[in-house]
Amino acid sequence: KSFENLVSWHQTAIDQTENPLTIQVGGKEPTAEEVMFNGILGTAGADPTADEWIASLDLVKDYTDIYQLSCSHIHQHLKTDQDVLKVHKAAKEMCAELQEYTYYIEVPKYTTHYTQGTQPRNKQNIITWINSCLGSIGNSKYVAYFAGGIKYYNEFGLLSNSDVMGTIFGLGDTSASNYGPWKSFAGMNRGVIYDGQGPVSPNYGSDSRYNELNELAQMYANMIVIKDTPSSGKQTMLWHCFSSQVKQDSERFLSIVRLNLYLKKTLRPILNKYLEEPNIWGTWKNIYLEVKPILDNLVDENAMSEYTWMGDQDAGSYSELSVNNEADVRQGKYKVILKYKDIVPMQEITINIVIDAASKSVNISENE
C-alpha cells in the first residue's frame, strides 16, 4: 500500500500527469513470472493473542518510574472487541492494584476493524464504545480514554488517518518534563499538536458544538479537536484531560492523579533511605527537613496551594506523639500524614456582558 501511495504521490503532486510510470528493478521491469529473492526466508510471526498481551503486562512491574501505560494499537492486532476489552480489564486491574501508573485507552477511530471498513466514529459511536468498555472493566481514576483519531501527513506527503496514543504520550511526557506531571497536558498551552491536521472523527472543537463536546467529556472522552487560538489560527489539540473516576472529586482530573503519583515516586526513595535507622523523633525530624524543599517547590509551581506534614517531627518524648503511638514506634513502625490543598485545571470561565441603559449621556475625552 505504501508503494502505491508513493506512485500516486509522484503522479499527482510531482508529475501532475496521469501518464503511466515505468518501474525497473536492476535494469529490468518486474513481471509476475520473474520474481527473484536473495537471502534466507524467515518464519512470519503470528498476531499476539489476548492472553499474550495480558502476560506481557507482568513485565511492566519491573519499572515504577513511568507515569503512562498503554497497549499500543491493540485494536488493530485483536479483531474482536471481546479480546480487546479482556486485555484492557487486566491492565486496569493491575494499575488499580499497584497504583503506579495511569492506563490510557484509545477509542478506535473506526467503527469496525480497519480490515472491514474505515468509517470514522462520531459522537454516539464514541460514547457507545466507552460505555461498553466501562461495562467490562469499570471506572477508575487510573484509566483515561482518548478519542477522535488524528490526521497527519505521512512520509510520502499523503494525508493519513492515524491513532492518537503516540501523540498523547508525547504530550504527557513533554508537559511533565517541562512543567511537571501535575499540569494538564490538554488545551491551548500544553496540548497543541502543531503538525496535526485535525481529528479523524468530526471536529467537536467548534464553538457551535460545545454541547456535544461537553457530552463527550461527561463520558470521560478526551478528544482531539481543532480550535481557534488567540495568535496561531486554527490548531489541532487535545481537549480535556479527565480520568474515568465516577466520584466527582479532584482525582477526576488526570493532572491530580499524576501529582499523587509524583509524590509517591519522589518521596518513596527518600523514606526508604531511613529504613533501619533509629525509629525516634530525631530521625523523623531529618525526614521532614529532607522532604520539605520538595513540597515547598510544589507550592511554588502551583501543584498545590498549601500542605501540612504531620509526622510527629517536633516531638521530644513519647508523651508528645499525636499521629504515632509508643507501642507501634517501639515495634519499628512510623506513620506520616501528608495533607494538601490541590489546584485543579480551570474548566469554565463565565463573563457577564451588561449594557448599562441607565445613563442617557456619553462623555468622550481625548488624552493629548
Question: What spans do the regions from the language model cover?
Answer:
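Extreme N-terminal leader/targeting regions
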Residues: 1-5
